[in-house]
Amino acid sequence: MLCGPLCRFLWLWPYLSYVEAVPIRKVQDDTKTLIKTIVTRINDISHTQSVSSKQRVAGLDFIPGLHPVLSLSKMDQTLAIYQQILTGLPSRNVVQISNDLENLRDLLHLLASSKNCPLPRARGLETLESLGGALEASLYSTEVVALSRLQASLQDMLWRLDLSPGC
């Protein structure tokens, strides 16, 4: 009688260990799909095509550009900054993108936990509140530059996810 639950557990063990590996691949695929979806949403906003992601715009240096090395924690930190910037904009174009960034950050946390990476919840810019006046004066420029740089960062993240980034 004591062997009953133990025997069932041992019988199910190969299936349970196999099922463990499948979701991580699915999470990685879902992450890539969501990145592609966000890039498509940005492409659908017509005015984002007018600025290069590499172009320097005075006063908007707080918007992150491309990083040479993107670990999972750096990806999360970058997305947190973009999410904070987008939620500060009044445009309805960016609401869904901001929500997608939150979901993307959750997927990155799942990927990190699968690699036993302690990935603390990244915070956005602490100085963004002090830039309130500058943001209000240039909302359109901020939106265009932020979306353009976000798109370039997402495409870089997509490429780096294939290389299995570190913690």
From Swiss-Prot:
Gene Ontology biological process: activation of protein kinase C activity; adipose tissue development; adult feeding behavior; angiogenesis; aorta development; bile acid metabolic process; bone growth; cell surface receptor signaling pathway via JAK-STAT
Pfam families referenced in this protein's UniProt entry, alphabetically: Leptin (PF02024)
Domain of life: Eukaryota
Keyword terms of this UniProt record: Disulfide bond, Obesity, Secreted, Signal
Transmembrane segments: none
Cysteines joined through disulfide linkages: 117-167
Compartment(s) of residence: Secreted
Family: Belongs to the leptin family.
Protein name: Leptin
Source organism per UniProt: Felis catus
Gene encoding the protein: LEP
